[in-house]
Amino acid sequence: RGLGDVYKRQVLMGICAVKSFGKKGKLAEIVLYYETVAFVCGIFFWLYAFYPDIKVTTFCKGAELACYDWLVILLMYYTQYSTGLFKGIRAVKIAMILFSAVDSFVMIANVWTHKVFTISEITNSDIIIEYVKDGFFYRAHFLYNYIVIVVILIAFIFMIAKASRFYSFRYEVIFITLFVGFILDLATVRSQSIYDISTLIYGFMSMIIYYLTLSYIPVSYTHLTLPTNREV
């Protein structure tokens, strides 16, 4: 069942990524990048969860963690282009991109260095991961991701309070999904379960973002987009 669920989610994420291609506008471009990275992250998750080789599993886990760095950046840019926030922090964005590049290298190289984590055993239901919890890169990775998520959540709270109903519904759905995922991730961070909450949430977020940004039209707005008899 778990394998089937992963297949279905990957197919849906792939469809969202393909359908995002060719859409016009900066926000649509950010959605395309987010969908693509989320899809690639899902592939690494699938290999991590179901390929029974410690070296491959270690590499895929590192690549999966590297994807998180770029997903939070893309989520920040999505927030910027959908809400208008985060425009005047160019230096911060450059610092985030540089950190993500270095962190991605460290996470992928972990398959040889084991500076962040080591996978000691793979069973049918568990993957035993031993994190280097006092290590700089372990702490920096998780602290960076959690801080960015908290900032984005605060931004959406601000926008929900001031936006019209048309936009507030979108912000509320994204906020609730991200907030629930954040809490679940904090609650299960020490779990040895194969299923990584972060990847599941980012995958679910990719489908919600695609739908709300490029597909969703409220019933009250359909008269603005449906063709009239004269147009038909």
Give the location of each predicted region.
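Alpha-helical transmembrane segments of polytopic membrane proteins
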Residues: 5, 61-69, 137-148, 199-205
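Interfacial "cap-and-anchor" motif at the non-cytosolic start of specific transmembrane alpha-helices
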Residues: 45, 162-224
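Conserved small/polar residues in nucleotide/adenosyl-binding loops
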Residues: 2-10, 222-228
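Hydrophobic alpha-helical transmembrane segments of multi-pass membrane proteins
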Residues: 5-53, 60-77, 96-112, 174-190
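Alpha-helical transmembrane segments in multipass membrane proteins, preferentially the mid-helix core
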Residues: 13-16, 74-78, 142-165, 211-213
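Membrane-interface helix-boundary motifs at transmembrane edges
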Residues: 18-31, 80-92, 160-170
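Extracellular-loop-to-transmembrane junctions of the mid-late helices
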Residues: 5, 109-153
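Membrane-interfacial loop-to-transmembrane-helix junctions in polytopic alpha-helical membrane proteins
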Residues: 23-27, 53-59, 88-91, 133-140, ...
